[in-house]
Amino acid sequence: MSETTATEPAVQDQMPAYSEAVKSGLYAKKSGLVGKYDNVRRYWEDEISRAFLYPHLRRLLDRCESEMRRLRILDLGCGSADGFELLTGIRDRDANLHDVEVDLLTNEHLGFYRGVDLNQDLLEQASSLYGGNPKISFQKADFTNGLPLNGKEKAYDLYFTSYGTFSHHNEDETLVRLLAEIAERTEDYSLIVCDWLGRYSYEWQTLWTNDLSENRNMDYVVSYIYDAEEREQHRDELQHLTLRLMSRREAESVVARAAKAAGREIKALGFFDRSIFTGRHMDTAEYNPHAQPIRYGVNSLHEPNLRTDPGSLIIDYVPQKGFAFLNDYFEYLQMCWNSLIHYTVGLLDCYCEADEEYLTPVPEPPASYPAVLQDMMKRMKKVVSGVGWLTTGLPRENVIEPQLGYALRRLMRTLQKGQGCAHGLVGIFEVESA
């Protein structure tokens, strides 16, 4: 055995370099199967929100540019800058393929962003990420006590919330007052994005009620951050939040009251439901014993090198007595969802990789199916046949399954009705001076 020379350090002497890399967290093998920023959050919830926000933010930016000024944003309940990242992650759909900068809201367009939150730890995390930008500021304040602005502060163009923030208004009166303040402070034009927990999410079917004066607030337990075994081990340590459940009908009532109080119109531009069968508490079944871990299944579709069991994606909706309209709606969604999965499994079963063709003719989707379902089925047929030539790199796991995930996402995005039938209900409003 040769001896180590002065110019050839012993292997063990080099190990601290790896230890330092591990401590930095940069060597961590991050999974999108669980956690706050799982695959559903990144590829479904964030992107669905961005898709609905895009046309409104596009028009707002055009308006600011025509007035020779830049956009001012007030993010209420900013957390660790999640809202800022959601907005700056919106892509400009008019960008050319050769463009490198495709963000809609760039630093060039941003005049000022202020994030407001009551949690100091989240604010410190946000500041560590973006505090170096002089056009970004974070402030500790409770927006349920009113708009956290001083009398002389310039009005904002966009008043933004995300991921159920407005459900912290346990009493509608505080939200009415806040929205009225925004309307009163609007000098020319403002856009308001309101984000609540949906009243009729399948996740908390046991809380459904036909009397909107009941079950207005829920005891929301933050148990989804753990897997099933850890969840029970930490049961006594779990955080509980009191959060308002909101339907579209209730949201419209609150906004109408705020408009009346302000003496100005607050016009609804649209509502959308986010995460119909993929809300976080589908996997915990905390509020619905019939809930299935569909979110985990969808996370698996988008996880690299991981093969998903199609059976884990099949929904078996259990109706709730006394809610015929909701039962019909969820039954319809379930049938569309399951049909797309079964169709894709059939494609995989009859496709021959060696011959790069289907062994048997693939039937066309029935004309009675909704247009979006027919479209997604046809696209999945192209996906399966289009990657048949890939004999390495796990084409099913890394190409076909993610595309099925996106097809299911398009299905839910198209068939949602913005009524509060999902984990999140988002309303977009505008205030315009006469």
Predicted regions and their residues:
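Short alpha-helix
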Residues: 239-262
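C-terminal lobe and adjacent flexible extensions of AdoMet/dcAdoMet transferase-like proteins
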Residues: 277-434
